[in-house]
Amino acid sequence: MSNFGRRTWDREEYAEQARSGYDDRSLKATLTPIELQALKSKYTNYDHLIKGSLKDLNKRKLTANTESLSSFKRGKKFGFYCDICNLTFKDTLQYIDHLNHKVHAIKFENLFDEPLIIDIRDNDDVPQEEFELCYHNLIKDFVEVRSMETQSKRKRLLDTDVEKAKKVATKPSIESESKVSQMMGFSNFATSKK
């Protein structure tokens, strides 16, 4: 400690911590190969991960107000727990954001010596035939959907035209109206007041 109550930095202490390794390496040393494989499969299958996290969704537990102030806590507590990073999140949005975050991916790569995202390929490496096939299928699906939509619109328009024609045909025609009243659009020149 310095004279002003501040902590002084000991470079040797932090160098020793850096040489000893990170938390993920100690996690790797404490787990058996079976547990390590289970942990790996847990974080590579997102559907299974979310289903497991949501199993306690409707359970209610009381928490202190001090716990709900921050978005995550170190260690396993009530909420959504990340085994790799040893963090607990209060809601799914923060949890999923953490799973997609670079820090989580780096810890996963350090622990398992392989990338978290397995399906990575450069779009320049896609064969021309595969690209053309996907493109033609996409265009074909689009045309089919649009043709169905236009057919349904035409059918609706024809139905409304038929209904209008029926209404016009069922309207009684008044032969006794004068040409002037027909032209003006009313039946007679009488007043509506009584």
UniProtKB/Swiss-Prot annotation:
Pfam families, per database record: zf-met
GO biological processes: mRNA splicing, via spliceosome
InterPro entries the record matches: Snu23 (IPR040107), Znf_C2H2_sf (IPR036236), Znf_C2H2_type (IPR013087)
SUPFAM superfamilies assigned: beta-beta-alpha zinc fingers
GO CC, alphabetical: nucleus; spliceosomal complex; U4/U6 x U5 tri-snRNP complex
Source taxon at top rank: Eukaryota
GO molecular function annotation: zinc ion binding
Major localization class: nucleus
Positions annotated as zinc finger (C2H2-type): 80-104
Known function: Participates in pre-mRNA splicing. Part of the U4/U5/U6 tri-snRNP complex, one of the building blocks of the spliceosome.
Miscellaneous section: Present with 907 molecules/cell in log phase SD medium.
PANTHER family: ZINC FINGER MATRIN-TYPE PROTEIN 2 (PTHR45986:SF1)
Assembly with partners or alone: Component of the U4/U6-U5 tri-snRNP complex composed of the U4, U6 and U5 snRNAs and at least PRP3, PRP4, PRP6, PRP8, PRP18, PRP31, PRP38, SNU13, SNU23, SNU66, SNU114, SPP381, SMB1, SMD1, SMD2, SMD3, SMX2, SMX3, LSM2, LSM3, LSM4, LSM5, LSM6, LSM7, LSM8, BRR2 and DIB1.
Protein name: 23 kDa U4/U6.U5 small nuclear ribonucleoprotein component
Organism lineage: Eukaryota, Fungi, Dikarya, Ascomycota, Saccharomycotina
